[in-house]
């Protein structure tokens, strides 16, 4: 049980981190698009 908690936290953080970086990259892309007008 003690080892299941950290692995569960890591497995929970991986999708959150990847989704967050994807959203950040998308927002930066959109911002660059608007500046290029």
Swiss-Prot record:
<keyword id="KW-0150">Chloroplast</keyword>
<keyword id="KW-0812">Transmembrane</keyword>
<feature type="transmembrane region" description="Helical">
    <location>
        <begin position="5"/>
        <end position="25"/>
    </location>
</feature>
<keyword id="KW-0934">Plastid</keyword>
<comment type="function">
    <text>Component of the cytochrome b6-f complex, which mediates electron transfer between photosystem II (PSII) and photosystem I (PSI), cyclic electron flow around PSI, and state transitions. PetG is required for either the stability or assembly of the cytochrome b6-f complex.</text>
</comment>
<dbReference type="GO" id="GO:0045158">
    <property type="term" value="F:electron transporter, transferring electrons within cytochrome b6/f complex of photosystem II activity"/>
</dbReference>
<keyword id="KW-0602">Photosynthesis</keyword>
<keyword id="KW-0813">Transport</keyword>
<dbReference type="InterPro" id="IPR036099">
    <property type="entry name" value="Cyt_6/f_cplx_su5_sf"/>
</dbReference>
<comment type="similarity">
    <text>Belongs to the PetG family.</text>
</comment>
<keyword id="KW-0793">Thylakoid</keyword>
<dbReference type="GO" id="GO:0015979">
    <property type="term" value="P:photosynthesis"/>
</dbReference>
<keyword id="KW-1133">Transmembrane helix</keyword>
<comment type="subunit">
    <text>The 4 large subunits of the cytochrome b6-f complex are cytochrome b6, subunit IV (17 kDa polypeptide, PetD), cytochrome f and the Rieske protein, while the 4 small subunits are PetG, PetL, PetM and PetN. The complex functions as a dimer.</text>
</comment>
<dbReference type="GO" id="GO:0009512">
    <property type="term" value="C:cytochrome b6f complex"/>
</dbReference>
<dbReference type="GO" id="GO:0009535">
    <property type="term" value="C:chloroplast thylakoid membrane"/>
</dbReference>
<keyword id="KW-0472">Membrane</keyword>
<dbReference type="InterPro" id="IPR003683">
    <property type="entry name" value="Cyt_6/f_cplx_su5"/>
</dbReference>
<protein>
    <recommendedName>
        <fullName>Cytochrome b6-f complex subunit 5</fullName>
    </recommendedName>
</protein>
<dbReference type="Pfam" id="PF02529">
    <property type="entry name" value="PetG"/>
</dbReference>
<dbReference type="GO" id="GO:0017004">
    <property type="term" value="P:cytochrome complex assembly"/>
</dbReference>
<keyword id="KW-0249">Electron transport</keyword>
